[in-house]
Amino acid sequence: MKRGLFIVLEGIDGSGKTTQARLLARWFEDNGFKVVLTKEPTDTEFGKIIRKLVLEGSIIDGGRISLEAEALLFAADRAEHVKKIIEPALREGKVVISDRYFYSSLAYQWARGLNLEWLIEINKFAPHPDIAILLDIPPREGIKRIKKRSSQTEFDKLFKLQEKVRENYIKLAKMFDEIKIIDATKSVEEVHREIISSIKEIWGKNYGSR
C-alpha cells in the first residue's frame, strides 16, 4: 500500500483555511479517496487546554503562563496529533488534510517574540507535509472577514499582530520548499481551483500515477 498524501492549509485569521480544507476534502472524496480532515489545535486534551488559553488570554487557574510554556503546549498537542491521527492515516494510504500545522506555531509565536530556531527545534518531531498551501491575504481583509472590528483599539492591536504573522509566513515560505503561496483574495472557487492545480503538480513528482 502506498503512503497517503499529507496536505496542510495555512494562513492568517480570515484567510479561508477552513472553507478550503472542506472543499478539498470533498474533492478528494468525490474522486474516490479516503480522507481524514483534521485541525490544530486538536480535540485532544492538550487541544482543549489550548483552546481555553486562546479564549481566555493564556490564563490557567488565574495566572498567565509564559509564551514558552504556551509554545510547548502547542507542540505537545501536535505530538498527539502526529502519533494518533496523521501517521496512522498516512500508513493506511489516506489523504490527510490539516487546517493549520506547525507553521502556525512558527509564524504566530515568532511574531509574539519567541526565538524561531527554538520553535523549529521543539517541533522537529513533526513530519513535513507533501505540500503546505499558504493562503495569503492582507491583514485588513482577513480581519474584515472574521468581523472582529468591535472597537478601533481592538482592530489596531489585531491588525499589528496579523501583519507580523503574515510577514513571518512569507519568510517561512522561503525557508520551507513545501510551502506554496496562493492569493486568497480571489473568489472561493478560484482559490479552490488553484489549490487543486498545486496539488496535482506535486502529485506526479512524488507519487507518479495514483
From Swiss-Prot:
ATP binds at G11, I12, D13, G14, S15, G16, K17, T18. One of its GO terms (biological process) is dUDP biosynthetic process. This is Probable thymidylate kinase. Its EC number is 2.7.4.9. It is an enzyme of class 2 (transferase). GO terms for cellular component: cytoplasm. Belongs to the thymidylate kinase family. Keywords: ATP-binding, Kinase, Nucleotide biosynthesis, Nucleotide-binding, Transferase.
